Amino acid sequence: MKHRYNNVKCDSFRCRWSVSNKHLWETLNSYGCTPNKSLTLKFPDENIFKDKSLIRHFIRGYFDGDGCISYGINLIANVLGTIQFLQYVQKLTWPNTLRSNHGSVYTFSLTFSGVKSLTFLYYLYFNSNIYLDRKYQKFLQFKDCRFKEKSLKLLESKIGEGWDANPELITILNEL
């Protein structure tokens, strides 16, 4: 079997390994793995899923490839793709979150922020054990940060005194 491979050097942001083989390419295409999937992918027929609960795992796999988690003041979850694919994902989530990607007629983005992004990411990651670890860790960091922030605000409002009224409790919460 003729093949060609090219290892591309990894840096701190990305790594690429390229394998070219006609048989492998044809086999992957027969299973629906198409070139330029971000520009061509349509959501598969729901009947291919033995159980409808598996759809979120499929979406998570897609998100791991063409999604982004970023946070500053708010958490933002962003998924790039074709309008056909993202319309289906939007149907499972919230309306009015689908946008053209910088004026492109080929790619679109589904963007969630704040509570909607956290809910979307819980939908993807809850009780999951296969995921891109880098994105999962970002989700956990933000979730933990938001939990501590909300807990401190709740304590402050319930106690009726300043947040530093119980420094021992604050120390424990900060160590979570």
Description of each model-found segment:
Residues M1-L176:
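Internal intein/HINT superfamily modules and their associated LAGLIDADG
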